[in-house]
Amino acid sequence: MGIRFLRSYTPGTRNRSVSDFNEITINKPEKSLTFSHHRCKGRNHRGIITCRHRGGGHKRLYRQIDFQRDKTKVPAQVLSIEYDPNRNARIALLRYPDGEKRYILHPRGLKIGETVISDVNASIQTGNTLPLRNIPLGTEVHNVEFQPGSGGQLARSAGTLVELLAKEGDFVTLRLPSKEIRLISRHCWATIGQVGHVEAYSIVVGKAGRTRWLGIRPTVRGSVMNPVDHPHGGGEGRAPIGRSRPVTPWGKPALGQKTRKPKKQSNKLILRKRKK
């Protein structure tokens, strides 16, 4: 995978870069694994905005991804590497001997024609899935489960990986992409390797309209709003916020306020907090 830099034909192409899509081998997705997808645009079931700056964007079809890899002891062949508009990682299409097809996250280095398997005693090979207790120390993994059988939830974004540091008792120690070190049950499963499309975060958007294509709306400062819209709003000209500390549009403390519950049960499993 590489990055292609555009020439300065217009202000929108100046310093703009895009993926060259060289690793993509097919243009149309597997029809049986593709569904229409209604995006909530930041609203909850009552239509109230719970996540601001979401809405619009290009229409997308959802690709059903197999995060659980629950078809065990059956090898699968990699048919193609495809683009997925719903994530920044690429996806790989697998075909099992019985004809079933499934999508998985494309691990870095996995090529068409290779075979992957999900098994307790699977070999340490890129794309294979097995329990953490059977993975050697120092191995890079992705798509890691939080709870046994829950399906992969950790390290699913492009270029991410989790490093296995230690094993002790019923837990293994992992270093997450955020540099947080925490304990996970040794019975959780993970996939060997790093998620592909490593250069995804080096791509320069280049213009505001490209962000709108992704369904991200502009972020407006509260100090330039009216008092009815934000606690920071109002005043003549560039007025200060008029408070001892910044707050959210709903009056809750913002910018540095910790949001994790101090008595959360899983806090005892975190050995070192993440780095911001």
Curated annotation (Swiss-Prot):
Gene designation per UniProt: rpl2
Region annotated Disordered, chain positions: 221-276
GO biological process: mitochondrial translation
InterPro entries the UniProt entry points to: NA-bd_OB-fold, Rib_uL2_dom2, Ribosomal_uL2, Ribosomal_uL2_bac/org-type, Ribosomal_uL2_C, Ribosomal_uL2_CS, Ribosomal_uL2_dom3, Ribosomal_uL2_RNA-bd_dom
Places the protein is found: Plastid, Chloroplast
Keyword Chloroplast: yes
PANTHER family given in the database record: LARGE RIBOSOMAL SUBUNIT PROTEIN UL2M (PTHR13691:SF5), RIBOSOMAL PROTEIN L2 (PTHR13691)
Source species of the chain: Stigeoclonium helveticum (Green alga)
Pfam families with a match to the protein in the record: Ribosomal_L2 (PF00181), Ribosomal_L2_C (PF03947)
Protein name: Large ribosomal subunit protein uL2c
Any one Gene Ontology cellular component term annotated for this protein: mitochondrial large ribosomal subunit
